[in-house]
Amino acid sequence: GKIIIACLKQMMGAALGASIEGTYADVVDTKPTTSKMPFMTILDEYGYYAVKGSAVMPAQARSLGFSMIFAGQDLPAFEKASKEEAASIVANCNIKICMKLEDPDTTYALFEKSAGEALTSSVTSVELQSGMMGAGYVPNRSANVAFNKRINVRDLKDQGAGEAHILFKSSLVRGKMFYANPPKPQYIR
């Protein structure tokens, strides 16, 4: 993993270009950063091979034509190399996706804080009303308006295979992603 990080840094350096003089076509248009599609980079279980100095990668990736995904099970693994580096990586990643969560502390705090609060209304009480058809509860005519957390730890822990909470800017999307679960073959050739 650490060798891959070193190679990626070298690729990003090369994407800056070698010449600073010449025609626009020679200096700017020939750079790999002019591609219509970014170079996709997925760093799965990043925390286990994190190295100091990696925090600049997501900060510079977009301008160099790279799309970087830092994936892991928990935030403390990202912090093994450096807490400051982990915080910088989190801050420079625009989209945050939380699938099934098992760390109710540090990792949950990150997603809870990122999701923020929303103004919600709720009925303050109900009344028992009886009539010709029997009795039933009817909401009172008063409501309470307050800021509440947009996600809670149970939401994240109870997610099934492929389910996720996706945070982008101020948007929170509860979604279902592709989950490959092919049947096991009877025979293998």
Predicted regions and their residues:
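P-loop NTPase catalytic cores that bind/hydrolyze ATP
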Residues: R150-P185
